[in-house]
Amino acid sequence: MSWALDEFLSSVEEEFGVDIEDAEQLDTPGAVIDYVAATTKAQDGMDEEEHRDHVAAIVGELMARTLGVTRYREDWRFVEDLRVR
């Protein structure tokens, strides 16, 4: 895994207080979003969909900051489609 992707996943762990043990399985932005949404609790009365949207927004900000990626689809793969090296 690239240092940039490691940095991104570390920032996700820090931001959400989650442990990402099997990073190889999280090969798309959508997989990261789903993992975080499933392992964290919704706050402030959010339902599941609102919680996932909230997580997606933060993950998008972290991707922009650590990877320089600002436009993506959730099913795009980090290495092959987004060219994260």
Indicate where each model-derived feature is located.
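Phosphopantetheine-dependent thiolation modules in NRPS/PKS and related acyl-activating systems
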Residues: 1-85
